[in-house]
């Protein structure tokens, strides 16, 4: 039946076009995220003060929605040098015991109703996304009244979560700034005066003065500490592995000397 075949072809084409139009926005958002450059951050897992501050920020600002269910409160307290009582009084808000996993009270089914999707667990997010991306993402929320939560994000366009650190950072908006001209990957300077050549860019992130509790420098440090904690949480044995690895390398170097002397003793008659 040609009529039935024609209808079938038409329906198939309609479905294909619908799929294309549904997928295109996702590709556009992914491309925009890839094009936005990450700000590099140096994470020092030996800086316990920074890790403690990051743990505090995580507990107070992130654990309302996000769990770290592969991490235990006791392990964090031990690794970061936090006394048990201090940990329980200031960083545990769910009634959990010190040996329990860092879960949250919010149920996934409720989260889907409230947010459209359950917020992801953040235990391994630093390994999945990378510390540079996290550092950039947490600092690039900006006001966007067209979005459900009133904010958007440069590193994650059409983000589906609020800016939970807004009271620390302040109101960040898209505004105009004088930025240095870059050509061929090189910053341009006036050949006569040596001063940077700039132009006005009206797509820059700008924090409205005196709208946040922290200065820009203080906020960047706070985010760095949070990212450091997430990096630790994603691989809590890293420092111990590095310590053991040092001893292993020293042992191998020591063993090599004796192995070489033994080899020379065995082969002296051959040569």
Model-inferred region functions:
Residues 58-69, 226:
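The canonical Cys-X-X-Cys-His
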Residues 241-246, 250-271:
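Juxtamembrane interface at the cytosolic side of transmembrane helices
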Residues 208-245:
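Short, aromatic-rich amphipathic segments at membrane interfaces
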Residues 81-192, 200, 204-219:
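Electron-transfer interface patches adjacent to heme c in soluble/periplasmic c-type cytochromes
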Residues 26-32:
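Sec/Tat signal peptide C-region and signal peptidase I cleavage site
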């Amino acid at each position: 039946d040609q009529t039935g075949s024609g209808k079938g072809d038409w329906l198939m084409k309609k479905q294909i076009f619908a799929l294309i139009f549904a997928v295109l926005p996702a590709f556009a958002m992914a491309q925009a995220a890839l094009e936005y450059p990450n700000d590099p951050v140096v994470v020092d897992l030996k800086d316990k003060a920074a890790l403690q501050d990051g743990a505090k920020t995580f507990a107070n600002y992130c654990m309302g929605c996000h769990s770290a269910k592969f991490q235990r409160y006791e392990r964090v307290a031990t690794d970061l040098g936090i006394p048990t009582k201090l940990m329980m009084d200031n960083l545990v808000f769910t009634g959990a015991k010190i040996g329990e996993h860092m879960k949250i009270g919010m149920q996934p089914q409720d989260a889907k109703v409230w947010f459209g999707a359950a917020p992801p667990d953040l235990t391994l997010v630093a390994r999945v996304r990378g510390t540079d991306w996290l550092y950039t993402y947490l600092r690039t929320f900006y006001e966007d009244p067209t979005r459900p939560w009133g904010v958007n994000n440069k590193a994650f366009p059409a983000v589906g979560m609020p800016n939970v650190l807004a009271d620390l950072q302040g109101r960040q908006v898209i505004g105009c700034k004088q930025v240095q001209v870059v050509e061929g990957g090189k910053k341009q300077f006036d050949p006569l005066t040596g001063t940077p050549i700039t132009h006005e860019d009206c797509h820059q992130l700008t924090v409205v003065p005196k709208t946040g509790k922290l200065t820009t420098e203080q906020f960047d440090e706070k985010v760095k500490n949070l990212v450091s904690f997430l990096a630790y949480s994603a691989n809590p044995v890293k420092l111990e592995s590095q310590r053991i690895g040092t001893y292993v390398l020293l042992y191998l170097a020591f063993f090599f000397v004796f192995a070489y002397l033994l080899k020379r003793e065995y082969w002296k008659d051959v040569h």
